[in-house]
Amino acid sequence: MYGWINLDKPCGISSASAVNLVKKILNVKKVGHAGTLDPLASGVLPIAIGEATKVMPYAVDVVKSYLFTVQWGEQRTTDDIEGKIVAKSDIVPSSEDIKKAIPNFIGLLRQVPPNFSAVHVNGVRAFKLARNGQDVSLTSRDVNVLKLKLLSADQENNKADFYLLCKKGVYVRSIARDLGIELGCLGYVRKLQRVRVGCFRKKNAITLEMLKMLYNNSRKCSYLLPLWYVLQDMKHLNDVFSDIQIKKIKNGQNIELNNLYVVRNCGICYVSTGNVPVAICSIVNSVVRPVRIFNV
């Protein structure tokens, strides 16, 4: 069994726990996820099964989008609803105030991750240090926010809803924290849902309950997306090479192409035969070099 599951992760469990539940439901050992989602967040969590784990890097460095709610008036240790209150503010920002501040959070930015995050500090996860009461001082890093839009502002309940489109590495909790500081009202994430990870969309995602039902009722892998699902932007070469050449590629051997091949300099590509995955290859100067070989 190999392929992708577009999982709709529920609130209350970690991404690692979601992976373990998928392992248990499908009775498979080789499972991974592309892009951690906080336990208190819900939404799209791409799950790689079997040989699809070899193409996980191509599912991580992609555009992501979120819907989230910021609660104003408080700053919390975790920058979400789970943390302890460390500061308060009586300021209630208006829609106009929020819209004026938003441009400062779009584009190439320097962002400091939350102290309660999976960022490594001297080989230890920051959240582990923070939980043990140790001082955590994280450095800022480059992130890219493509779009940040105010969807609604509820002054009566002092909260606001947003849509975010960004590249990898952006922490929504940091945006809520920094936006609250910018407005002088403080803030933290009250609700967070990821609605897109590259080609994976929320509207097509399935829950753990749906996965279990589909597996028990059919066992035909109807819930699995193909391995190449995350490689749609990569050049695909199907039934281009001979059986002998395919065998060499599967054995990790380089092969040289003659001038009859129009693909002799196409860079990174996905190779298959009969639409069965063979390998990710690099083809430069008429030489095919296997980069990732699929054992299917």
From Swiss-Prot:
Pfam families for the chain: TruB_C_2, TruB_N
Q: Reaction(s) catalyzed by this protein?
A: uridine(55) in tRNA = pseudouridine(55) in tRNA
EC class name: isomerase
Alphabetized, the UniProt keywords read: Isomerase, tRNA processing
> Which Gene Ontology BP annotations are present?
mRNA pseudouridine synthesis; tRNA pseudouridine synthesis
Give the EC number. Answer: 5.4.99.25
Name the residues annotated as catalytic in the UniProt entry.
D38
Annotated GO molecular function terms are: RNA binding; tRNA pseudouridine(55) synthase activity
What InterPro entries does the annotation carry? PsdUridine_synth_cat_dom_sf, PsdUridine_synth_N, tRNA_psdUridine_synth_TruB, TruB_C
The protein's role, per its UniProt record: Responsible for synthesis of pseudouridine from uracil-55 in the psi GC loop of transfer RNAs.
Q: Which NCBIfam families match?
A: TruB
HAMAP family xrefs: TruB_bact (MF_01080)
- Family according to the record: Belongs to the pseudouridine synthase TruB family. Type 1 subfamily.
The protein in question is named tRNA pseudouridine synthase B
**Which species is the source of this protein?**
Ehrlichia chaffeensis (strain ATCC CRL-10679 / Arkansas)
Its lineage opens with: Bacteria, Pseudomonadati, Pseudomonadota, Alphaproteobacteria, Rickettsiales
